[in-house]
């Protein structure tokens, strides 16, 4: 296969890895943000922790995979991206570290104040990635000030522009809704009722922020140009809207798993909508279009991409099957018996 074909395949796979990460770790992050609002008692807070408990660390594998693929398949894009977005990515790393610590440390001491401290850490360390990921991807869609040498000529505050902030709030609302639906699946009783109501309240928020983000995308980016050049891509926003519409429909029908699947479809299609709108661009330069790093000029050698593709065709299905088995194993709603000494 030629370099252009291989680079295109890996661009799609790279997008898919990010989409899968957003779907799987998105509900974990959303649960953490919802913790102080839905966890009214110690038992309810433990239910929220344990709704994410068996999954959260395995879900982060997809983030590592996305970063690893960026490094191996698109080394030039990796170098520029991690240099330009160094500050938000470092903040993201620290947030994920503290999130892991909050899971493990919370129940190590029998003290209400100790648990309250780590509940606060847990909330912040889940809120931050939601916002940071949205801000980072919105700025990638819009373009960042990098020159032909890959040197970033901006600042962290420069990333907090109107479009970046809209992206952060949009991601936050999606993950919160996604997490609320997961809590409907994993709980019973009063907590489930409040989670269901919360998902219903968040749905119109997601819709409004989606419309705002789409309007700002028209004025701030060139994403829609790809949809004029490649009309078949219109299936992505159509499927995204179908997924979003399916959330309240399935919740009202008492089918939370299908509602969560609809939310997952929405997340996947929104991710592909934005990233495929950049194609073949990966790091769009707002200073000089010639300095833009694309999937073609930033890719590894054809031999490297072929070897990686062979490995991916073997390993990715294995990981997917394992995670499917794990989700199936822990698909039952939580009960008080699940909150034993070994639970969170």
What residue ranges belong to the model's regions?
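Hydrophobic alpha-helical transmembrane segments
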Residues: 159-174, 301-319
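Long, contiguous internal "core" modules enriched in hydrophobic/ aromatic residues
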Residues: 105-259, 273
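Juxtamembrane membrane-water interface segments of multi-pass membrane proteins
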Residues: 31-54, 72-75, 104-115, 179-198, ...
């Amino acid at each position: 296969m030629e370099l252009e074909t291989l680079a295109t395949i890996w661009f799609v796979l790279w997008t898919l890895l990010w989409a899968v990460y957003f779907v799987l770790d998105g509900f974990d992050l959303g649960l953490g943000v919802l913790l102080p609002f839905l966890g009214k008692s110690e038992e309810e807070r433990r239910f929220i922790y344990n709704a994410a408990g068996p999954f959260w660390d395995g879900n982060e594998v997809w983030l590592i995979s996305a970063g690893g693929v960026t490094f191996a398949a698109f080394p030039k894009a990796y170098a520029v991206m991690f240099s330009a977005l160094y500050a938000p990515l470092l903040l993201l790393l620290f947030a994920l570290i503290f999130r892991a610590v909050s899971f493990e440390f919370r129940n190590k001491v029998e003290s209400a104040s100790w648990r309250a401290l780590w509940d606060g850490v847990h909330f912040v360390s889940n809120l931050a990635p939601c916002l940071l990921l949205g801000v980072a991807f919105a700025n990638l869609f819009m373009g960042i000030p990098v020159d032909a040498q890959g040197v970033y000529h901006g600042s962290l505050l420069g990333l907090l522009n109107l479009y970046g902030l809209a992206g952060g709030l949009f991601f936050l609302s999606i993950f919160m809704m996604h997490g609320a639906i997961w809590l409907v699946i994993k709980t019973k009783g009063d907590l489930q009722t409040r989670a269901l109501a919360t998902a219903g309240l968040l749905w119109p928020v997601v819709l409004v922020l989606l419309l705002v983000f789409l309007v700002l995308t028209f004025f701030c980016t060139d994403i829609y140009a790809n949809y004029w050049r490649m009309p078949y891509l219109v299936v992505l926003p159509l499927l995204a809207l179908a997924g979003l519409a399916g959330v309240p429909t399935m919740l009202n029908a008492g089918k939370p798993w299908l509602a969560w699947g609809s939310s997952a479809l929405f997340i996947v299609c929104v991710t592909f909508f934005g990233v495929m709108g950049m194609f073949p661009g990966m790091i769009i330069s707002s200073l000089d279009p010639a300095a833009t790093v694309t999937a073609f000029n930033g890719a590894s050698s054809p031999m490297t991409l072929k070897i990686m593709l062979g490995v991916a065709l073997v390993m990715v299905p294995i990981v997917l099957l394992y995670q499917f088995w794990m989700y199936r194993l822990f698909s039952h709603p939580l009960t008080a018996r699940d909150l034993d000494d070994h639970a969170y």
